[in-house]
A protein has these predicted regions:
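N-terminal beta1-alpha1 cap of cysteine-dependent amidohydrolase-like domains
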Residues: 21-111
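Catalytic nucleophile loop
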Residues: 111-112, 135-155
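Glycine/threonine-rich flexible loop motifs
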Residues: 115-124
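Catalytic-core regions built around general acid/base machinery
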Residues: 101, 126-138
């Protein structure tokens, strides 16, 4: 029954993607500092013309103005395009002026914070629809930290569900049904993403996600590092590493629910490397 949570979301996404593969790109950052080079790569990926504008969505954070201030300053060094702050609330989900601007943005940037807070505002609303329309029509959608986690259809919330459920940077156990997965934006349907990966040693968390969804590659992006996704092609940019778990073999559990398996594929990539999602 683990897919029940996503039944409505799948129907929602099928309606949006019925006209084919999205034309846009995803620029998924693992959190932490963003070097000038990484920001320049982001701007280059978006292929901004002089008339294009950038929308920042800061709803993940409790300090949206601060988050907007910092990313705006970084982007202004790399380009001269107009940068707009759209801090949607639940009352704004039908704001036609904002929604029209959002769906016609050439670059959308989602800040860090709490991915669940963001999705509580956006999920199954015209805001999500506008983001997906922009992406389908060729926009680049970028996100960092929480903004990275929510890119997937299957979003890691960071919560563990068994035993000590106090939030920790990583998981202290590998057990069945310990990881909480909720519905994300659905921009990345063929993989699950985690962030701050090497710095916060989130291997147990990502292995738990792989055990829950063994058919999906699970991607851990470290800080100051990004993956650039175009269709099924992925390129790595930035200062650190990207770890990918996939191809889990003979998954099973003991009587206490501990995860067991015989083999998996582990890949590590750095700046300039490319890999492929799917068969």
């Amino acid at each position: 029954m683990k897919h029940k949570l996503f039944f409505t979301g799948i129907s929602f996404l099928l309606c949006l993607y019925s006209f084919g593969q999205a034309k846009g790109k995803l620029f998924i950052i693992g959190g932490g500092d963003r070097s000038p080079e990484l920001i320049q790569t982001l701007v280059s990926t978006a292929q901004l013309s002089a008339k294009d504008y950038i929308v920042v969505l800061p709803m993940s954070t409790e300090e949206p103005d601060t988050a907007y201030y910092y990313i705006k300053g970084e982007l202004e060094v790399a380009c001269s395009n107009r940068i707009v702050n759209m801090n949607f609330t639940k009352k704004d989900t039908s704001n036609t002026k904002w929604l029209d601007s959002l769906q016609h943005a050439r670059l959308i940037f989602i800040t860090g914070g709490d991915q669940t807070r963001f999705m509580n505002i956006v999920l199954h609303t015209p805001i999500q629809r506008a983001i997906l329309k922009a992406y389908n029509n060729g926009a680049t959608v970028a996100g960092t930290s929480a903004g990275a986690a929510m890119m997937s259809s299957h979003m890691i919330t960071g919560n563990n569900l068994l035993g000590d459920t106090t939030y920790h940077a990583t998981f202290k156990q590998l057990r069945k049904d310990n990881i909480e997965i909720q519905e994300g934006l659905g921009l990345l349907t063929s993989a699950i993403v985690d962030q701050h990966f090497v710095v916060r040693s989130r291997y147990n968390r990502l292995l738990s996600a792989l055990a829950k969804y063994p058919g999906l590659p699970c991607i851990g992006i470290d800080e100051a590092t990004a993956i650039i996704v175009h269709g099924k092609n992925v390129k790595v940019a930035g200062d650190s590493q990207v770890i990918v778990f996939s191809n889990l073999k003979n998954l099973r559990y003991d009587a206490k629910g501990h995860i067991k398996f015989d083999d998996l594929r582990l890949s590590i990539y750095t700046d300039g490397d490319n890999f492929h999602l799917g068969k």
